[in-house]
């Protein structure tokens, strides 16, 4: 969609899904994944609103850098984006080297997503 509000709504929906999963022991890997999705959609929506451009890709680091360059107050959030970004692929597919996501990591992802969404709202 080229309507930034659609991206913001989907981001909020993903964050709410992550909150429900965390509250009801629905899987820390799914919490981390939905936090990544919320952050990605919020960044894409903000960039669409600000620049008129809908960017491709899933890298939170790339999107955070683009948003910062476009004036978003995210200089201190690049580390959070890099942290949550690591869970995007790792949590989606089975792997021989799979490392489970701890509750602490899931909560850290949740904190990062909430912080980013507050800054860009």
Segments from the language model and where they lie:
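Terminal alpha-helical segments
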Residues: 1-121
């Amino acid at each position: 969609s080229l309507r930034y509000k659609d991206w913001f709504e989907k981001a909020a929906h993903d964050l709410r899904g992550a909150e429900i999963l965390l509250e009801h022991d629905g899987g820390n890997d799914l919490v981390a994944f939905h936090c990544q999705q919320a952050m990605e959609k919020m960044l894409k929506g903000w960039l669409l609103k600000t620049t008129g451009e809908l960017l491709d890709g899933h890298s939170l680091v790339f999107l955070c850098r683009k948003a910062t360059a476009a004036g978003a107050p995210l200089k201190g959030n690049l580390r959070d984006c890099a942290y949550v970004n690591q869970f995007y692929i790792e949590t989606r597919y089975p792997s021989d080297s799979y490392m489970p996501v701890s509750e602490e990591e899931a909560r850290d992802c949740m904190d990062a997503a909430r912080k980013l969404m507050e800054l860009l709202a």
